[in-house]
């Protein structure tokens, strides 16, 4: 959803990976690669060499992009961050280098994230993101619980059910 949007409005997005502290860290990277290949675009992933297990997402986004922006790399790119907290660090790195990400500019830097973190709509610029469909997730959880209560010998296998997100286009991309 967001990979396709960024490719359409600002060029092939670069994926800024996040620390591997939960299962979706790698899943989002894999989904990005699959979508880029589907679009016939070359995936570019950054930040993998700086990954830690501490979960300092904002510091990670800041450190990785500060290093690239210092060399003049990715200053006119669309950057898709693995989550909104990484994107907050990315926005900070952009500010440190006098860069102004934004959807209202032609070309230039665009930064987006995932999760619709509560502060995303209050950042400057406001952060373009994908919100999780909490209502659908909740309904699926209730349905699964009801199924478990109704069935005498419920199979407790782990299942993964993907839900469509909701694109929140804001000022950053």
Residue ranges and their predicted role:
Residues 1-173:
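Bacterial carbohydrate/catabolite-sensing allosteric modules
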